[in-house]
């Protein structure tokens, strides 16, 4: 199990933005990205070492 520092960047329908930086298990990044997107009804992108590793859009 590998710990990584992940930066989540999210955009709401009204174009406002949020960021969150956490250290977590690499295997959980996709799940966490989906949760942030669903809960916030936002487009969320996850970055590890400045590389986008996943993206989920729940702005509907």
UniProtKB/Swiss-Prot annotation:
The keyword Plastid does not apply. It comes from the Viruses. It holds the Pfam family Dmd. InterPro entries: Dmd. Keywords: Evasion of bacteria-mediated translation shutoff by virus, Host-virus interaction, Toxin-antitoxin system. Disruption phenotype: Phage grows very poorly in wild-type E.coli K12 or in cells expressing plasmid-derived toxin-antitoxin system LsoA-LsoB; if the host has a deletion in rnlA-rnlB no effect is seen. Absence of full-length transcripts of late (18 to 28 minutes) T4 genes, and thus loss of synthesis of late proteins. Partially suppressed by overexpression of host IscR. Coiled coil: none annotated. Antitoxin component of a potential type II toxin-antitoxin (TA) system. Acts as an antitoxin against host toxins RnlA and LsoA, preventing them from degrading T4 bacteriophage-derived mRNA and thus permitting successful virus infection. Stabilizes middle (8-10 minutes) and late (18 to 28 minutes) T4 gene transcripts. Can form a complex with non-cognate host toxins LsoA and RnlA. This is Antitoxin Dmd. It comes from Enterobacteria phage T4 (Bacteriophage T4). The lineage of its organism: Viruses, Duplodnaviria, Heunggongvirae, Uroviricota, Caudoviricetes.
């Amino acid at each position: 199990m590998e710990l990584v520092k992940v930066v989540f960047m999210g955009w709401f329908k009204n174009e406002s933005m949020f960021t969150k930086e956490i250290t977590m298990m690499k295997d959980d990044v996709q799940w966490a990205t989906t949760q942030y997107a669903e809960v916030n009804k936002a487009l969320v992108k996850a970055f590890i070492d400045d590389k986008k590793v996943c993206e989920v859009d729940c702005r509907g």
